[in-house]
Amino acid sequence: MQRLLAPARRVLQVKRVMQESSLSPAHLLPAAQQRFSTIPPAPLAKTDTWPKDVGILALEVYFPAQYVDQTDLEKFNNVEAGKYTVGLGQTRMGFCSVQEDINSLCLTVVQRLMERTKLPWDAVGRLEVGTETIIDKSKAVKTVLMELFQDSGNTDIEGIDTTNACYGGTASLFNAANWMESSYWDGRYALVVCGDIAVYPSGNARPTGGAGAVAMLIGPKAPLVLEQGLRGTHMENAYDFYKPNLASEYPLVDGKLSIQCYLRALDRCYAAYRRKIQNQWKQAGNNQPFTLDDVQYMIFHTPFCKMVQKSLARLMFNDFLSSSSDKQNNLYKGLEAFKGLKLEETYTNKDVDKALLKASLDMFNKKTKASLYLSTNNGNMYTSSLYGCLASLLSHHSAQELAGSRIGAFSYGSGLAASFFSFRVSKDASPGSPLEKLVSSVSDLPKRLDSRRRMSPEEFTEIMNQREQFYHKVNFSPPGDTSNLFPGTWYLERVDEMHRRKYARRPV
């Protein structure tokens, strides 16, 4: 198999292809030769300036082929009806059998993305994985994914795994954009992979699990552009959720502390983001304050769906406290009694929560509710949770509705690391445009979720017990029928006596 061309030779080849097609680098191939998402099939010619509009070109979502219904779990666990479905806002929870692990999830989602876009494997120059599902303390998931690039001869691929609870995917996305806007960029695309298996021991936390992976193709001239200079970040040392027991998949969780940490990080990230965007506006002659009115859609890391509704309400409270008295009285009806409070005094105030949820309900329905479809029906995907929300948002709106909008995003990982950032959506929603094709690519999300097999709580519990039994077991082949997997799914075929893992793929 031909080795990857050297960078200088590659750029010459790109120029020759462009010339033969009578195209400049700024244009696309003829319609008959276009890849999905209108992505050029060859690497981009590098220039001396920053590439324009770096962001998400294509997106792929993977989740397991089986789920347990939360109403069934409520009955099985002998809790009151609505504890999970209303209290947590969860309807179904996807889960993996012992045939799937973090490597197989990421293999599946990357191969699906590459096959759908028909992008040459040597067009990828960076691949980074965000995950907290650690099955080896040394060997990265990224090294396993390199198996997919073997036939292309492409071994010149930067990036490695990034880990900090649910934040690793966002760090990987930022790293990809930073690489592309640096002197180290060689003109090729970046792949960002986020994936996790969220499992808990039997008890109150188990219904907040889930599993899945998201792969994103990053490049210039994207339909979802990362807004430059607009990241508000907060990091601190906290033991709200952590995994010190390396012999178990299960975390240690301080639930109340974790919610407080999440909300505190949200407050501080939002303040930092507002400060930066207002500075940009001020330099452009605009002295208006930034509020949620300047964001058409808002997505969040989603440990459970009810948390997201509280988080949007929290952002409204930030806007309320920073606004003038006139605006507080006119724009934020029902919140007047709380204008003397400080943010840090309200994390456990149920009266504030109740008033905020009521005041922000219409905004939640317009800006955020559609983004929770995957989380509601599949559960918490940890690092990929935020980007599953992005896919859900795209799947529930037309390209015309999304065009020109700003999508705010809040990413949180316990321990803790958090960022508030934003995407600017392309204004071009015409048929065949990158935006229209990106939206179209995730339009089957509801249909795919409905195609999964419903498992009983007893079957779910048995599989959780199997995962405990086989965790770090050697010299075995996982039990199960591979025909129960979705077509094209990679699975763990065997673990040998030296812990080496072998994978196979179910035929498409």
Swiss-Prot record:
Pathway: Metabolic intermediate biosynthesis; (R)-mevalonate biosynthesis; (R)-mevalonate from acetyl-CoA: step 2/3. The modification N6-succinyllysine is found at residues 52, 83, 118, 221, 256, 310, 327, 333, 342, 350, 354, 358, 447, 473. (3S)-3-hydroxy-3-methylglutaryl-CoA binds at residues 80-81, 166, 204, 208, 258, 301, 310, 380, 414. Succinylated. Desuccinylated by SIRT5. Succinylation, at least at Lys-83 and Lys-310, inhibits the enzymatic activity. It is an enzyme of class 2 (transferase). Its main location: mitochondrion. Residues 1-37 form a transit peptide. The keyword Mitochondrion applies. GO terms for cellular component: mitochondrial matrix; mitochondrion. Keywords: Acetylation, Cholesterol biosynthesis, Cholesterol metabolism, Lipid biosynthesis, Lipid metabolism, Mitochondrion, Phosphoprotein, Steroid biosynthesis, Steroid metabolism, Sterol biosynthesis, Sterol metabolism, Transferase, Transit peptide. The active site is at residues 132, 166, 301. The modification Phosphoserine is found at residues 433, 440, 456, 477. PROSITE patterns: HMG_COA_SYNTHASE (PS01226). One of its GO terms (molecular function) is identical protein binding. Liver and kidney. It catalyses: acetoacetyl-CoA + acetyl-CoA + H2O = (3S)-3-hydroxy-3-methylglutaryl-CoA + CoA + H(+). The keyword Mitochondrion applies. It is found in: Mitochondrion. InterPro entries: HMG_CoA_synt_AS, HMG_CoA_synt_C_dom, HMG_CoA_synth_N, HMG_CoA_synthase_euk, Thiolase-like. The modification N6-acetyllysine is found at residues 83, 118, 243, 256, 306, 310, 327, 342, 350, 354, 358, 427, 437, 447, 473. NCBIfam families: HMG-CoA-S_euk (TIGR01833). Catalyzes the first irreversible step in ketogenesis, condensing acetyl-CoA to acetoacetyl-CoA to form HMG-CoA, which is converted by HMG-CoA reductase (HMGCR) into mevalonate. Homodimer. Belongs to the thiolase-like superfamily. HMG-CoA synthase family. This is Hydroxymethylglutaryl-CoA synthase, mitochondrial. The gene is Hmgcs2.
